[in-house]
């Protein structure tokens, strides 16, 4: 028969069972094992001795009942006082000789520790077993009370800590704006707002983004810009689903879906959802342009327009299409371009089923239904409903102008080839009211049809009083085989200086007899045998102009007779 006793192991605080072989007739054993007490109630073991687990216990003998009467002499006496466990100590001991921790539960009915159920969580049991620790934990302090706000607004009830804050707030109800900008005259209700506004004129941008280095003149603008780096857009439009990084941007966007527009323009009664948008719109009526370009001096009514304009000098195109790679200087142009790839046409005509990708295209299309033609040609006054139609129409004038310039150049080249000389202009050879379709210089060709050879000026009036561009009357020039008749009396024209004009106003009168002219300088009768006076500037100097037969004319006169008319 085998029995187990608890003995103290040298070098170890706890007790360990020792199994010995006993005879069945041993006197030490109680013949009735049922009377054995499993655990003695009189001796109170040391808690340190209980906080161990035997390392060499055979699992098959775990259910053996220890015998309390054969305790080791070194064990504590039954009357010894147990030591109170430290409430702050750990509920289990991690001795290197111990296999694992044994949880100890504080019995609420006693002051001793007893082995507990191994299934109990040691951490939770340790927390629940030491109510003294909870009592000594620091108490949670209440939140400090907010400072009092004794100054309340009588209009809206808002409270302020200082009277100055209330005074500034009441200006929002009264509309008082005592702080005026010396540059543009704009007024503000707060001095800090004026200081930020003046940065627009001075170019100061004290608020800089730490991520990209971009600077802004307003702190609120910087806060809105930061959401572009994080990509977080928690505010979604309930109408179209568009997301925004700030609630204020969503509120502004909701007004595009038919929201309230409380800010009305006093000039045209147009409504706006924001007061800043109304101020920008008023500049279209006043013509104010407070934002000049530092490179070219061009001024703009909005700072955003100036920034977009400055990209024309720097050639900066920061907005690139993800589909085709095309870059743009403005984000709005990129948005319009993206509709080419997506096929989106959000602007529908209310009169027909046609839709457009841009609002400007819809406005031009509406002119088709209304009949309005706001685009007018500056040359002919013709009006069109679309700007593209006016552009196409202007090409008609450009082609006509090019043709007229080519005809004038050809006529000038022909006149230069005749060598009429500097004193004979084409305008002096035309009668009053006569129009030539060959151009202003084409009339100079008329001189060769009157018997003038190229390079000569036959029959030029030698009278120094006559104009340098006058020609003799063709009827006074005798032809071969004809009689020479006396010169008819000229009829004075409306020009007060008769005989000194260019000659086309002197018309012969066959009904009147020849009467001596009272003019002291009458036109001399031509010589029956005229001799050409050589032109010192003509390359054909010394040649005689050939005479034409009666009733004949040069070929070019016959060909151009329809253009020159019967008087040519």
UniProtKB/Swiss-Prot annotation:
Residue segments, region Disordered: 1-117, 448-568
Main location as per UniProt: nucleus
Amino acid composition bias (Pro residues), ranges on this chain: 511-537
SMART domains according to UniProt: ZnF_C2H2
Assigned GO CC terms: nucleus
Listed PROSITE patterns: ZINC_FINGER_C2H2_1, ZINC_FINGER_C2H2_2
Segments crossing the lipid bilayer: none
Compositionally biased tracts (Low complexity): 448-459
Keyword presence, DNA-binding: yes
Compositional bias per record (Acidic residues), positions renumbered to this chain: 20-75
Presence of keyword Transmembrane helix: no
Compositionally biased residues, Basic residues: 1-15
Keywords carried by this UniProt record: DNA-binding, Metal-binding, Nucleus, Repeat, Transcription, Transcription regulation, Zinc, Zinc-finger
Subcellular location: Nucleus
Basic and acidic residues bias: start-end ranges: 494-503
GO molecular function terms attached to this record: DNA-binding transcription factor activity; RNA polymerase II cis-regulatory region sequence-specific DNA binding; zinc ion binding
Function: May be involved in transcriptional regulation.
Protein's recorded name: Zinc finger protein 358
Origin species: Homo sapiens (Human)
């Amino acid at each position: 028969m085998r029995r187990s006793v608890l003995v103290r192991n040298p070098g170890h605080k706890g007790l360990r069972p020792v199994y010995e072989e006993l005879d069945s007739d041993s006197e030490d054993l109680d013949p009735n094992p049922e009377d054995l007490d499993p655990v003695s109630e009189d001796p109170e073991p040391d808690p340190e001795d209980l906080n161990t687990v035997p390392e060499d216990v055979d699992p098959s003998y775990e259910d053996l009942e220890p015998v309390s009467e054969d305790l080791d002499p070194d064990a504590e006496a039954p009357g010894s006082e147990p030591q109170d466990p430290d409430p702050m100590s750990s509920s289990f001991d991690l001795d290197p000789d111990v296999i694992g921790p044994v949880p100890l539960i504080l019995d609420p009915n006693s002051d001793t520790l007893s082995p507990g159920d191994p299934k109990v969580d040691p951490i939770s049991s340790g927390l629940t077993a030491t109510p003294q620790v909870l009592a000594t934990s620091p108490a949670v302090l209440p939140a400090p009370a907010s400072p009092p706000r004794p100054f309340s607004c009588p209009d809206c009830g808002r409270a302020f800590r200082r009277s100055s804050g209330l005074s500034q707030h009441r200006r929002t109800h009264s509309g008082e704006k005592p702080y005026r900008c010396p540059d543009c005259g704009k007024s503000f209700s707060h001095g800090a707002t004026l200081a930020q506004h003046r940065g627009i004129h001075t170019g100061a941008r004290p608020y800089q983004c730490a991520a990209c280095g971009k600077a802004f003149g307003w702190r609120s603008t910087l806060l809105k810009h930061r959401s572009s780096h994080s990509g977080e857009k928690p505010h979604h439009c309930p109408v179209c689903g568009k997301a925004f990084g700030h609630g204020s941007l969503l509120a502004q966007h909701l007004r595009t879906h038919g929201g309230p527009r409380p800010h009305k323009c006093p000039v045209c009664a147009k409504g706006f959802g924001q007061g800043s948008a109304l101020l920008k719109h008023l500049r279209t009526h006043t013509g104010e342009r407070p934002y000049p370009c530092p490179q070219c001096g061009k001024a703009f009514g909005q700072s955003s327009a100036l920034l977009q304009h400055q990209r024309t000098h720097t050639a900066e195109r920061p907005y690139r299409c993800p589909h085709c790679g095309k870059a743009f200087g403005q984000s709005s142009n990129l948005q319009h371009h993206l509709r080419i790839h997506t096929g989106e046409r959000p602007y529908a005509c209310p009169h027909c089923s046609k839709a457009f990708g841009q609002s400007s295209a819809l406005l031009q299309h509406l002119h088709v239904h209304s009949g309005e033609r706001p685009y007018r040609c500056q040359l002919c006054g013709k009006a069109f409903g679309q700007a593209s139609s006016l552009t196409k129409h202007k090409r008609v004038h450009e082609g006509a102008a090019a043709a007229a310039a080519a005809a004038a150049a050809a006529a000038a080249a022909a006149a230069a080839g005749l060598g009429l000389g500097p004193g004979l202009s084409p305008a002096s050879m035309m009668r009053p009211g006569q129009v030539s379709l060959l151009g202003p210089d084409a009339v100079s060709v008329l001189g060769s049809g009157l018997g003038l050879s190229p390079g000569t000026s036959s029959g030029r009036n030698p009278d120094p009083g006559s104009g340098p561009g006058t020609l003799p009357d063709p009827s006074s020039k005798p032809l071969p085989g004809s009689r020479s008749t006396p010169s008819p009396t000229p009829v004075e024209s409306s020009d007060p200086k008769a005989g000194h004009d260019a000659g086309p106003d002197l018309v012969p009168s066959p009904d009147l007899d020849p009467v001596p002219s009272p003019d002291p300088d009458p036109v001399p009768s031509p010589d029956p045998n005229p001799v050409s006076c050589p032109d010192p500037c003509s390359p054909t100097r010394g040649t005689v102009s050939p005479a034409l037969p009666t009733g004949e004319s040069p070929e070019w006169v016959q060909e151009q007779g329809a253009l020159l008319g019967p008087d040519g």
